[in-house]
Each structure stands twice: as structure tokens, then as C-alpha cells.
Amino acid sequence: MARTTGDPAKRRRCMSRIKFWRRSRVGSEVVEKDTKRFKLSLIKAWLLRIRQEDYKYSGSFQEAIKPVLIIAQIFALMPVRKVSSKFAEDLTFTWFSVRSYYALVTILFFGVSSGYMVAFVTSVSFNFDSVETLVFYLSIFLISLSFFQLARKWPEIAQSWQLVEAKLPPLKLPKERRSLAQHINMITIVATTCSLVEHIMSMLSMGYYVNSCPRWPDRPIDSFLYLSFSSVFYFVDYTRFLGIVGKVVNVLSTFAWNFNDIFVMAVSVALAARFRQLNDYMMREARLPTTVDYWMQCRINFRNLCKLCEEVDDAISTITLLCFSNNLYFICGKILKSMQAKPSIWHALYFWFSLVYLLGRTLILSLYSSSINDESKRPLVIFRLVPREYWCDELKRFSEEVQMDNVALTGMKFFRLTRGVVISVAGTIVTYELILLQFNGEEKVPGCFEN
């Protein structure tokens, strides 16, 4: 029987299909192996990332405060160069930089705005609302000047801080190294978000007057911009450009007012963390056999931290004073205004959110600031755990220093931020509120602004 070959074209197509399916079957095994390798590589990369996260943070103050300083420079505060560096020796200040020019121009605008506010209060309208606006812009002008002055000293302060940190017992656990940075980041995010919400609600409440009694009925944007800076435009002819400039100044001033508290809180948390680092180290060794050299080294570290706290306080005491005096004034003013009827729901929401946020911010600021003093006194508790046979003259000297020193931030030496300051602030608020209520006249719903 003769062998038939069939159609050569069909035969070639059939053979190509057979080869294709054979290759695909082999390829499926290869693909499956590649998929397993890919999954294993993902797991390996994830594990490596975990190990890298452990060493991502060094635990230094410069590393923790870096995001705060970057945000500050966006809003024309703290014009220090290379704040994104993890090393304090990289920080520099120079007058001839974009940051410094930006900060100086902003300070100039704050000063001009304050001057117009003074003129408005003295010659046009002297009442509680106008004085409150004047106090706000004057305090912002002083705050911006204080931060510019601090920026000139900051590189030296950061280097001193880094030297003190280098001599402290090392932070061994990754959780300990990232704790300070995460704490300061949380403070910054929460406070900045609340400030943003407060400002948005302020603009929404201002929209009530834009709709009810606009400056120009057919130009709502211009009416809004005019209303944002109406005290200045009483003396200066309004233009769209000046309206935008006025709104920018208003936003920058609002952030500067809130950043004042954020910065003092961040510095307080960092100083308290360094004292806590030393205290935890002594607590671990307190019940164990210790030597004179051990307590001598601990006392030197404690003394270095006290000197660092004093150096920082000398640099930021003006900012601290402005911070607490501002909060005290505006809390009294807002509590007094709480008895006024509100013209719209947005006014009511904005007012109560602003009051609660201000009260909470002041309370948290007081507690964070007082934690420095609390941690500086904590060694007295640790010393009681030391066995009698290991008690020595060096430890006695250390105990006397801790007992005699009063380590805390101050408001230009007028007051010290200890835990008792919370009660003092509350008592002062109640006292001033009672005085203000005696002079409080009949309250009415604020009407449209007069030309």
C-alpha cells in the first residue's frame, strides 16, 4: 500500500500547531516557576523593607523636627538653609537667600498691615472686634520677627543639641528611634489639619456677609477679598491685585499664629524625650550593682541636658511668651463672644470649633511644656530604688542637683512652664472673664459692614 503524504500546506500547519502546544505546556511550567520566584522576591523585598525601616530613623532631634521646619519655610518662617538634612552641621543661615528674602518681605507685609490696623482702631472704630484684629496682626508681626531672630541662632542650637544627644545612652530599639519623629509628625499633622479646617470655616462664615450685603453685588469674589482685609482697604483703594495680596497675608498670618504653638510643642516634646531617654537608662540599672563612674556619667549627661534646656529657652522664650499670652487673650475674647447670637449656622460652627480647638491646643501645649520639668524631677524616684550598699557620694550629689534645679521652659523668665501653669492659666481665664462680663454691654447680631 502506497504511503500518502497529503497536502503539504495542511501538514505544515498541523505540525506547527503540535509544536505550539508542546511549547505552551512546557512554558506553563516555566511561568509557574517564575510566578513562585516573583512571589518569593516580593516577600524578600518586604522583609528587607522592614529591616530598612528599623534603621530609617536615627532618633535625633534634627531628624524629627525636619518636617516642621520645611512646612514653616513654606509659610515664610525659619529661613534656615538645608533643613532637610539629618545632620545639624549642614544647617546654615544667610541673609542672601531666597528664604530670607521671602521671610523679610512677609514680615514687611505683616508690619504694614499692623500699622493700618492701628490707624483703623485709633481713628475709625474702637471696639472689641477691631481691637481683637489689631492684637492678632501685631502678635503675628512680633511672632514672625521672633522666628527670624531664632533662625539666625538655630544652626548653633541644633549643633549643641546634636552634641548632647551623642553623649546620651544610645537608643537600641527601632521603636525608640522612631518614637520622637512620629510624635512630632502627629502633632504637626493634627494641628495643621485643625487650623486648615478652622480657616475654611472662617471663609464659609464670611460668605454670609458676601451674600447678604456685598460690597459689589455683581462681583462676589471682589466682595470676599475686600471683606478679608476691610480695615486696610478703608485707607487704600481696592484693586483685585491688592485683594489677592491681602488674602495671602491673611493665610500666612493664620498659619504663623498656629505654628507658634506647634513649634513650642515640638521643642517641648523633644526636650522631654531626651530627659526620658536618660531616665529610662538609669531605671534599668537602678536595682543592679552600679559604680561611682556610672553615676558620674549619668550626672554629666543630666547637667548637659539642663544646659541645653537653658540654651533653648534663651532662644525661644519670646516665642513662648507670645504663644501663651495670645492664647490667653483669645480664649477670654471667644468665651465672652459665646453669649452673642450668631447670624448664621456657619458662624456658630466656626465659632465653637475655633473655641474648642483653641482650648484644647492651649491645654495640650501646657501639658507638653510641663513634661520637661516632670522628666527632670523623675530621677528622684529612680534614686529611691538604688540599694543601700551601692549608694555613694556621687549619687548624693546628683540627687541634690536634681532637687535644687528647676528645669523648665519660660516665658522670658516671667513664668516657668510646670504642671501648675495649667491651673494658673485656668484661674487667670476665669478672673479676666468675670472682669470682662462686668463691662459687657447688650449683645446683638452683627450686621452688615459699613462703608
From Swiss-Prot:
<keyword id="KW-0675">Receptor</keyword>
<keyword id="KW-1133">Transmembrane helix</keyword>
<dbReference type="GO" id="GO:0015276">
    <property type="term" value="F:ligand-gated monoatomic ion channel activity"/>
</dbReference>
<dbReference type="GO" id="GO:0034220">
    <property type="term" value="P:monoatomic ion transmembrane transport"/>
</dbReference>
<dbReference type="GO" id="GO:0033041">
    <property type="term" value="F:sweet taste receptor activity"/>
</dbReference>
<feature type="topological domain" description="Extracellular">
    <location>
        <begin position="205"/>
        <end position="223"/>
    </location>
</feature>
<feature type="topological domain" description="Extracellular">
    <location>
        <begin position="272"/>
        <end position="344"/>
    </location>
</feature>
<protein>
    <recommendedName>
        <fullName>Gustatory receptor for sugar taste 64e</fullName>
    </recommendedName>
</protein>
<keyword id="KW-0472">Membrane</keyword>
<keyword id="KW-1003">Cell membrane</keyword>
<dbReference type="InterPro" id="IPR009318">
    <property type="entry name" value="Gustatory_rcpt"/>
</dbReference>
<feature type="topological domain" description="Cytoplasmic">
    <location>
        <begin position="152"/>
        <end position="183"/>
    </location>
</feature>
<feature type="transmembrane region" description="Helical; Name=4">
    <location>
        <begin position="224"/>
        <end position="244"/>
    </location>
</feature>
<feature type="transmembrane region" description="Helical; Name=6">
    <location>
        <begin position="345"/>
        <end position="365"/>
    </location>
</feature>
<dbReference type="GO" id="GO:0050916">
    <property type="term" value="P:sensory perception of sweet taste"/>
</dbReference>
<feature type="transmembrane region" description="Helical; Name=7">
    <location>
        <begin position="421"/>
        <end position="441"/>
    </location>
</feature>
<feature type="transmembrane region" description="Helical; Name=5">
    <location>
        <begin position="251"/>
        <end position="271"/>
    </location>
</feature>
<keyword id="KW-0812">Transmembrane</keyword>
<feature type="transmembrane region" description="Helical; Name=3">
    <location>
        <begin position="184"/>
        <end position="204"/>
    </location>
</feature>
<dbReference type="GO" id="GO:0170023">
    <property type="term" value="F:ionotropic sweet taste receptor activity"/>
</dbReference>
<feature type="topological domain" description="Cytoplasmic">
    <location>
        <begin position="1"/>
        <end position="100"/>
    </location>
</feature>
<feature type="transmembrane region" description="Helical; Name=2">
    <location>
        <begin position="131"/>
        <end position="151"/>
    </location>
</feature>
<feature type="topological domain" description="Cytoplasmic">
    <location>
        <begin position="245"/>
        <end position="250"/>
    </location>
</feature>
<comment type="function">
    <text>One of the few identified sugar gustatory receptors identified so far and which promotes the starvation-induced increase of feeding motivation. confers responsiveness to glycerol and is required for feeding preference for beer and other sources that have fermenting yeast.</text>
</comment>
<feature type="transmembrane region" description="Helical; Name=1">
    <location>
        <begin position="101"/>
        <end position="121"/>
    </location>
</feature>
<feature type="topological domain" description="Cytoplasmic">
    <location>
        <begin position="366"/>
        <end position="420"/>
    </location>
</feature>
<feature type="topological domain" description="Extracellular">
    <location>
        <begin position="442"/>
        <end position="446"/>
    </location>
</feature>
<keyword id="KW-0807">Transducer</keyword>
<comment type="similarity">
    <text>Belongs to the insect chemoreceptor superfamily. Gustatory receptor (GR) family. Gr5a subfamily.</text>
</comment>
<dbReference type="GO" id="GO:0005886">
    <property type="term" value="C:plasma membrane"/>
</dbReference>
<feature type="topological domain" description="Extracellular">
    <location>
        <begin position="122"/>
        <end position="130"/>
    </location>
</feature>
<dbReference type="GO" id="GO:0007165">
    <property type="term" value="P:signal transduction"/>
</dbReference>
<dbReference type="Pfam" id="PF06151">
    <property type="entry name" value="Trehalose_recp"/>
</dbReference>
